């Protein structure tokens, strides 16, 4: 069985548990998503980044 290390977004603690042992916050995977040359969600990710940063948006 493979274990994936997780990281607490609140305090930055690394653990193998679902919740942080220090603050009790739900942990997230510390690994990036698998690379794919086709990048099926690339368009959505770039659009969200532009909207979030306000790039190319007329005000």
From Swiss-Prot:
Gene Ontology CC terms, in alphabetical order: ribonucleoprotein complex
Matches recorded under PANTHER family: H_ACA RIBONUCLEOPROTEIN COMPLEX SUBUNIT 3, RIBOSOME BIOGENESIS PROTEIN NOP10
Keyword Ribonucleoprotein listed: yes
GO terms for MF: snoRNA binding
Gene Ontology BP term (one): rRNA processing
Name the record gives this protein: Ribosome biogenesis protein Nop10
SUPFAM superfamilies linked to this entry: Nop10-like SnoRNP (SSF144210)
Entry keywords, A to Z: Ribonucleoprotein, Ribosome biogenesis, rRNA processing
Protein species of origin: Thermococcus sibiricus (strain DSM 12597 / MM 739)
Keyword S-adenosyl-L-methionine among record annotations: no
Known function: Involved in ribosome biogenesis; more specifically in 18S rRNA pseudouridylation and in cleavage of pre-rRNA.
Family, as annotated: Belongs to the NOP10 family.
Gene designation: nop10
